From Swiss-Prot:
GO terms for biological process: gibberellic acid mediated signaling pathway; photomorphogenesis; regulation of growth; regulation of timing of transition from vegetative to reproductive phase. Residues 5-60 form the bHLH domain. PANTHER family: TRANSCRIPTION FACTOR PRE, TRANSCRIPTION FACTOR PRE2. It comes from Arabidopsis thaliana. This is Transcription factor PRE2. Keywords: Gibberellin signaling pathway, Growth regulation, Nucleus, Transcription, Transcription regulation. InterPro entries: bHLH_dom (IPR011598), HLH_DNA-bd_sf (IPR036638), PRE (IPR044293).
Length: 94
């Protein structure tokens, strides 16, 4: 079997159907608050859903970073041997 034929087969087997894409977009519509709050969320285009999903994920990452920074600052301000410090360390280290 030629290399290009194997590539085409691997590529086609990893593709998802239009129905699967539609289902995934629908699940994203239900998951993203900015879209879910829109009364006409079913009319929002797939590209808009993907754009809002990316924005939402970026915002979540920023919030997680901010919370981690705040926990680090809090940890620096308390007794490192206290039970609270142990809890904060467990939150920071996941």
């Amino acid at each position: 079997m030629s290399s290009s034929r194997r590539s085409r087969q691997a590529s086609s087997s990893s593709r998802i159907s239009d129905d699967q894409i539609t289902d995934l977009i629908s699940k994203l519509r239900q998951s993203i608050p900015e879209i879910r709050q829109n009364r006409r969320s079913n009319t929002v285009s797939a590209s808009k859903v993907l754009q809002e999903t990316c924005n939402y994920i970026r915002n979540l990452n920023k919030e997680a970073d901010d919370l981690s920074d705040r926990l680090t600052q809090l940890l620096e301000s308390i007794d490192p041997n206290s039970p609270q410090a142990a809890v904060i360390r467990s939150l920071i280290n996941g």
